[in-house]
Amino acid sequence: MMENFKHTTVLLDEAVNGLNIRPDGIYIDGTFGRGGHSRLILSQLGEEGRLLAIDRDPQAIAVAQAINDPRFSIIHGPFSALADYVAERELTGKIDGILLDLGVSSPQLDDAERGFSFMRDGPLDMRMDPTRGQSAAEWLQTAEEADIAWVLKTFGEERFAKRIARAIVERNREQPMTRTKELAEVVAAATPVKDKFKHPATRTFQAVRIWVNSELEEIEQALKSSLSVLAPGGRLSIISFHSLEDRIVKRFMREQSRGPQVPAGLPMTEAQLKKLGGRELRVLGKLMPGEKEVAENPRARSSVLRIAERTNA
């Protein structure tokens, strides 16, 4: 039975306001979660409006299926495939806004059985969709030491990546780890210098979770797909929670707002320049949570909301 873990939606009003909701518009909530953003979007839509929600977490799907609204539909799958979902419904180029709330949700962190948290002992899983792919335990038991170290360094920015990777491999040789507490203890023991403000396993758990769920690849594919999915004037409203996510979003919006970069002095006709295309997006800005929101929900502290608009190019 699914427990009712509380989830406070971060930057709720700001992210939805960023979509500039039209009552008859068609919108996508690519990360339904517990439905905070979706419910607010629905409250602003008229009878002709539509909302397509996506999530790969079966628990989120169960929550979404309880919403009885003809304007609303839910898809169980990764948001990276949003272009396919839209094409199946013959809505390519007709979407008025896409909202993405990236990273792991509070219910996923708080449920020990999901294996996302080093603070709660549970199965070493970390999959956002437990029905697909390798669990964290399975990957750590089969991966090479060098590959584990690369993941910890690349996705966790862990300076002791090699030491921790060696400790993980040695422990798994003795007895395979299957619990989050076991991994947290191995990482803590392998970390020579402790940060008094952060648990030593924080970066390792982040890195393994990102790797197991292909999170950064998911983001990159969804952003790329958004250009074909959005209607002219359609909005992108994206919340990220750590620098790796935000870097991808920021770079994408910046590149698509500049248009093709042609070296100075390159002999090209006006027709050739036009063929290259213009700016795909107009960046509208970024927002951070206010002091009041952070005080009420400390997990909002690192969040960043970036908003962009599809041009007519």
Curated annotation (Swiss-Prot):
- For this UniProt record, give its keywords in alphabetical order, as a comma-separated list: Cytoplasm, Methyltransferase, rRNA processing, S-adenosyl-L-methionine, Transferase
Q: What does the UniProt entry say about where the protein is found? A: Cytoplasm
- Chief subcellular location: cytoplasm
Q: Indicate which residues the UniProt annotation says bind S-adenosyl-L-methionine.
A: G35, G36, H37, D55, F79, D101, Q108
Reactions accelerated catalytically: cytidine(1402) in 16S rRNA + S-adenosyl-L-methionine = N(4)-methylcytidine(1402) in 16S rRNA + S-adenosyl-L-homocysteine + H(+)
Q: Name one Pfam family in it.
A: Methyltransf_5
List its EC numbers: 2.1.1.199
Which molecular function GO terms apply here?
rRNA (cytosine-N4-)-methyltransferase activity
Which terms does the UniProt entry file under GO BP?
rRNA base methylation
An example GO CC term for this entry is:
cytoplasm
Matching InterPro entries, A to Z?
RsmH, SAM-dep_MeTrfase_MraW_recog, SAM-dependent_MTases_sf
Leading EC class: transferase
Per its database record, what is this protein's job?
Specifically methylates the N4 position of cytidine in position 1402 (C1402) of 16S rRNA.
Q: Which family does it belong to?
A: Belongs to the methyltransferase superfamily. RsmH family.
Q: What is this protein called?
A: Ribosomal RNA small subunit methyltransferase H
User: What is the species of this protein?
Assistant: Salmonella arizonae (strain ATCC BAA-731 / CDC346-86 / RSK2980)
